[in-house]
């Protein structure tokens, strides 16, 4: 009888540990602080690295804020790229509490250039898939140019591909 109880207790412990390992893969449904880092590119030759930090409500909803660094190489009138700093609010909703989950997200904020007066408003809705701790998304990005070097072009429209890691 003692062997049976010891074996049962050992199996219950192992199953509990296995269940904990499996649920750690579902980062979108864990309540508390969450962060991510992402690399992205757009069709207009912008290359970015961003990080977002915020709160996950435990039901698939994440709200946070982020900052990044962007190199913009499409402006033909100069040989050197422009370096920009995006600052944004970030909202994301993951639909499933599974290892693979589709999501929708939106980033709204500003893009700031310290070299020139070329500050822009940023709107970036995105759809994608989270696979465990990794995320891949495809989105539309609108950058409205307030004032600066790009004359006769009030806004820029991009398709942005993003690959990220969720902590």
Placement of each model-derived feature along the sequence:
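Repeated loop/turn-to-beta-strand initiation elements of outer-membrane beta-barrel proteins
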Residues: 60-63, 98-102, 131-138
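Solvent-exposed loop/turn segments connecting transmembrane beta-strands
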Residues: 38-48, 74-84, 111-120, 148-156
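Residues that define the transmembrane beta-barrel architecture of outer-membrane proteins
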Residues: 31-33, 45-47, 81-87, 100, ...
